[in-house]
Regions:
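Extreme N-terminal leader/targeting segments of oxidoreductases
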Residues: 1-42, 60-62, 73
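N-terminal Rossmann-like FAD-binding beta1-loop-alpha1 element of flavoenzymes
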Residues: 37-68
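Short beta-strand to alpha-helix junction loop
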Residues: 91-92, 138-157, 212, 292-293
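Helix-loop-beta segment of a Rossmann-like dinucleotide-binding subdomain
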Residues: 129-148, 185, 283-288
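Predominantly flavin-linked oxidoreductase catalytic cores and closely associated redox partners
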Residues: 161-301
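FAD/FMN-dependent oxidoreductases across multiple families
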Residues: 289-403
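C-terminal helical "tail/cap" subdomain of flavin- and related membrane-associated enzymes
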Residues: 376-498
Length: 498
């Protein structure tokens, strides 16, 4: 059955679509006259992952979708100024993969054909939790692993293959037009300094952490939104490596997690195998335990500061392909727009503009995809321009947003100074139960699957309160705790550790 977003799109790899894409984009940017009335025009602010998926969501419903982007978007996988986080590790959990595939059928295959890795969870994961090493249970879910540049270019190519979608690159958003009752368009400044208004029947803010929506709403006469922040003080340091030759294909994810029960800062690390035989390695630490931005301290931190030296041992045998990229932009921040007493028609906020998470949990990409799918489905169900549609969408996207928010802040709130008042009694009770579940999951495959049901964003946290899960948590793990990383002898040999 066709969906509103899949009609008029074509598939193909970024390399296949690169030729001619710049010409198509240029024609779209130049031709802004003689188009449909504003009532059937959608404007998406931001051309990153969530913005492009929102454009795909609306392409089958609007006559024209205009993506307004501050950067000039590349026609192939390449860095850009407005996405510094692309230098760090990213993963797309299966809950987000399914949503993205619904919006852009076949895009997962296009990604894997271009070199992205589909890693089964927890089969291809070597994870040290606070309670010990997880076993590598049979596949329950999966993650897509790829450099952010490849992921974005693949999605962008698919979306822009639809002639109803156009990009205004090098364009700054100045504000919204309309009033407290309804948004009617956006004011922009183009690359030549010219300011103008784009009238629209729907506006989506997907501009990320730097979103101007709180200010734009007050400019329209609406109250400031409720906001909550949980800041663990996490600092991120990432570096790209070429894996040893025999470990360039099929090597597992490596994750050394912090123990939030221990006093002092938390330190952790990820090693993600991505395209072209590379490993992207991200090390992080909370206040007082931050990694250094210095290249020559990267391996030392991984070996000596994490709870196990495995990542440091692995990268000491790999070839560095980049210097260290460093950031402190990791605060959890959520705007509760769904709670506002009034909400303007024709306006929706998605992605990091709505809620930004500590990236260590890897949920931002998945939530963006799920939210774009909600936008498509509700617009299709209730009809373009229907009364109350934007408020319905804003309330509905709070569901996937809230699931990821609870997962992130439920851990981070325990670090010193993370929130104004510290963890609540509820936070402590939930954390104690989750800790017991994680302990049980080290030696119980069924409970490990229930946990990954939630972390993959495929099911809600209520599944963890089922009677069978409660009983299993009371019993604890059925197998003894592993004392060493569950790498096979062959994997150790391929990584030159044996």
């Amino acid at each position: 059955m066709s969906t509103p977003s899949s009609r008029g799109t074509t598939s193909g790899s970024p390399a296949e679509k690169q030729v001619g894409e710049g010409d198509r984009r240029g024609r779209r940017e130049a031709d802004l006259s003689g188009r449909p009335s504003p009532a059937k025009v959608a404007v998406v602010l931001g051309g990153s992952h969530t913005g492009m998926l929102a454009a795909a969501a609306l392409a089958g419903l609007a006559d024209r979708v205009v993506v307004v982007e501050r950067d000039e978007l590349p026609g192939e996988p390449a860095p850009r100024k407005g996405l510094p986080q692309a230098r760090h590790a990213h993963m797309l959990w299966s809950g987000g993969v399914r949503a993205m595939e619904d919006l852009l059928p076949g895009v997962t295959g296009t990604l894997t054909d271009a070199g992205a890795r589909r890693a089964p969870v927890t089969t291809d994961m070597v994870v040290l939790s606070a309670h010990g090493w997880f076993r590598r249970w049979p596949e329950s879910h999966h993650v897509i692993l790829a450099g952010r540049d490849l992921l974005d270019a693949t999605v962008r190519t698919r979306v822009l293959a639809d002639d109803r979608v156009e990009v205004l690159g090098g364009t700054e958003v100045l504000g919204l037009t309309g009033d407290a009752r309804a948004v009617t368009g956006v004011r922009v400044r183009e690359r030549d300094g010219r300011e103008r208004t784009i009238d629209a029947g729907m506006v989506v803010d997907a501009t990320g952490r730097a979103s101007g929506t709180p200010r734009w709403l007050t400019d329209l006469g609406l109250p400031a939104p409720e906001r909550r922040e949980v800041d663990s003080g996490l600092a991120y340091a990432s570096r790209l490596y070429l894996a040893p030759e025999q470990a360039r294909d099929g090597f597992p994810v490596i994750n050394v997690q912090p123990d939030t029960r221990a006093a002092g800062p938390g330190r952790a690390g990820f090693l993600l195998p991505i395209e072209d035989g590379r490993w992207i390695v991200t090390l992080n630490g909370t206040r007082g335990g931050e990694p250094s931005p210095a290249d020559d301290d990267f391996v030392r931190f991984a070996r000596e500061e994490l709870r196990h030296p495995l990542i440091g041992d692995l990268i000491s045998r790999a070839e560095p392909l980049s210097g260290v990229s460093f950031t402190r932009t990791t605060v959890n921040r959520r705007y509760f727009y769904e709670r506002m007493p009034a909400w303007p028609e024709n306006f929706t906020v998605l992605g990091d503009a709505l809620a930004a998470y500590n990236p260590v949990y890897g949920h931002g990409l998945a939530v963006g995809a799920q939210s774009a799918l909600v936008l498509r489905d509700l617009t299709w169900r209730y009809g373009w321009g229907s009364a109350g549609l934007s408020r319905r969408v804003q309330k509905a996207v709070a569901r996937p947003v809230g699931a990821a928010w609870e997962l992130a802040t439920g851990q981070d709130v325990f670090y010193p100074g993370a929130s104004e008042n510290g963890p609540t009694a509820r936070d402590r009770a939930v954390a104690a139960y989750v800790s017991r579940l994680m302990y049980t999951a080290t030696g119980n495959g069924r409970i490990a699957r229930r946990v990954t049901d939630v972390t993959s964003l495929e099911r809600r946290a209520e599944v963890l309160l089922a009677p069978g899960v409660l009983l299993a948590a009371a019993v604890g793990p059925l197998k003894p705790t592993l004392t060493e990383p569950p790498l096979t002898a062959e994997e150790l040999k391929r990584a030159e550790l044996r």
